[in-house]
């Protein structure tokens, strides 16, 4: 597989298909792979499940995919700044799997490490635990959470090399490292090669 591409569109060539799961790095709008998201929008791929810290804003980040109606499901921990996202969820046009932030990070890490699931106390006894397996450990209730795997992971790194090693700096070191590992394929946009 070629390691360096002329642009984001070329990097995603041959990887995209309707109904796929895409995990995208970033925290809020910091460290998001905006060029790869734009290439995904331009591809017209639809019925996507998108996984990330948030749903972007109306005209940037993952919000661009929502605006073009390419998404069927969102798995995220924060969704409060995107009016189109809110409209689609309330109208029943979009499925939402709201996941606590730490749990989402661990689900991504677990998926990347090949761990199918883990138990956590987070969300125990809440609506988020409904329909999930629960167990008692040391007299406390724990909820089973499954690891997340994606068909493609897209991230933004400060630096990368031709072997695929990535360096994330400062706030961009948020969800990018975990998301980089959870995809069958990872594509990144780096500032330096």
Where are the regions a protein language model picked out?
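Conserved alpha/beta enzyme-core scaffold
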Residues: 1-193
């Amino acid at each position: 597989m070629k390691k360096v591409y002329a642009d984001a569109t070329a990097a995603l060539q041959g990887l995209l298909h309707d109904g796929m799961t895409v995990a995208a790095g970033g925290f809020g709008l910091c460290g998001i792979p905006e060029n790869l998201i734009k290439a995904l929008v331009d591809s017209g791929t639809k019925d996507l499940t998108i996984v990330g810290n948030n749903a972007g804003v109306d005209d940037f980040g993952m919000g661009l995919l929502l605006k073009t109606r390419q998404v069927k499901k969102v798995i995220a921990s924060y969704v409060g700044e995107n009016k189109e996202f809110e409209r689609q969820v309330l109208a029943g046009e979009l499925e939402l799997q709201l996941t606590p932030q730490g749990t989402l990070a661990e689900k991504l890490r677990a998926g990347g490490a090949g761990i199918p699931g883990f138990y956590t106390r987070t969300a125990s006894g809440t609506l988020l635990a409904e329909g999930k397996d629960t167990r008692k450990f040391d007299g406390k209730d724990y909820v089973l959470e499954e690891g997340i795997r994606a068909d493609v992971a897209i991230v933004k790194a400060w630096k990368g090399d031709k072997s695929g090693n990535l360096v994330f700096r400062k706030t961009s070191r948020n969800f990018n490292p975990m998301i980089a590992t959870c995809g069958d394929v990872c594509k990144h946009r780096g500032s330096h090669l």
